[in-house]
């Protein structure tokens, strides 16, 4: 195809049509100094030189590929099978966007359908949407779909043991809405009991929001929470760590009405904290309140199976006041990564990963508990994270560890008032015994 740019005559006729003589007159409102600013750029270099310079910069970073990491708190260092990245790189999939003529892209729709099916199997729920942005926004959307002002249900009760960032996002979502948020205080045990939340639940409560395992890694009594919430007509919203569900009972079997979660652990690298993947699944009775998109399977006139977008209740497609959310593009590419990851591991593979996380974290806890002046904090079972009380400022300890090539845990005082002496430590299937022993000796040295 031959491209013919505008000729001088074409430009002259266009300028005459809009009533100006010169092109520069169109930009008269912009100060001259800003029209063509002189940028302080270095001299041009070759592609090979650029690559070498960027590589040198990147080598200044601490990578979990070369550094022992005990940092979790929502973003976890799990192994990603090579097949996940290979499939993501395929040109047919390498976009996060859902096509505007979706039925033309049967491969994309089937991948999302499989994602929804896997999430339902994992969580024990009846319906899942096509993904959300991350665990925090998924939790906020999951809580809001329970709110019903016409029924007088406009109060959200949130366990203090839910991730602080998730609670912050929920407060942001509800700002300006006729919704009140009540937070249940964090007990010294770092594990809430059903009786702890009962006094905060009443006829105005839309839902109770908890985490499973909670922010401190402890496993709380979901069935007890569900019983307390349902007794007052409220729903139970549970934010999950998907890998833990390889060992733990699905929240759907324990009475959860809405399940949300962060899917980064399902085949997505940490990558400085993003991109992530939001999981949102509910009981079928709430399907009309689900935000985002929902893919379904059907049969065409010739009897052939096909996939269609059955629900997309967002403001681009229906009246704004009727939309369930203003979420636009979902995390389609990351949902594909999770689909390939779960399909590759299978039920037994996921259980094996969860078992490794569990046993390595408990070995780490046992070793630290033997250190003088160090205490493992919390009550009840935990999965792969736990809090410890440090004999020295956790931030100073982390700086000491980093000098020795170890990424320490999260200094909880940075997120939770009153927990300045606590550190949250994590272990995954990639954590080795040698790394754990090296951390313990470094902690011993740091507080000698």
Curated annotation (Swiss-Prot):
The glycine cleavage system catalyzes the degradation of glycine. The P protein binds the alpha-amino group of glycine through its pyridoxal phosphate cofactor; CO(2) is released and the remaining methylamine moiety is then transferred to the lipoamide cofactor of the H protein. The lineage of its organism: Bacteria, Pseudomonadati, Thermomicrobiota, Thermomicrobia, Thermomicrobiales. Belongs to the GcvP family. N-terminal subunit subfamily. It comes from the Bacteria. It catalyses: N(6)-[(R)-lipoyl]-L-lysyl-[glycine-cleavage complex H protein] + glycine + H(+) = N(6)-[(R)-S(8)-aminomethyldihydrolipoyl]-L-lysyl-[glycine-cleavage complex H protein] + CO2. One of its GO terms (molecular function) is glycine dehydrogenase (decarboxylating) activity. The glycine cleavage system is composed of four proteins: P, T, L and H. In this organism, the P 'protein' is a heterodimer of two subunits. It comes from Thermomicrobium roseum (strain ATCC 27502 / DSM 5159 / P-2). This is Probable glycine dehydrogenase (decarboxylating) subunit 1. Keywords: Oxidoreductase. Its EC number is 1.4.4.2. GO terms for biological process: glycine decarboxylation via glycine cleavage system; nucleoside metabolic process. CDD domains: GDC-P. The keyword Transmembrane helix does not apply. The keyword Oxidoreductase applies.
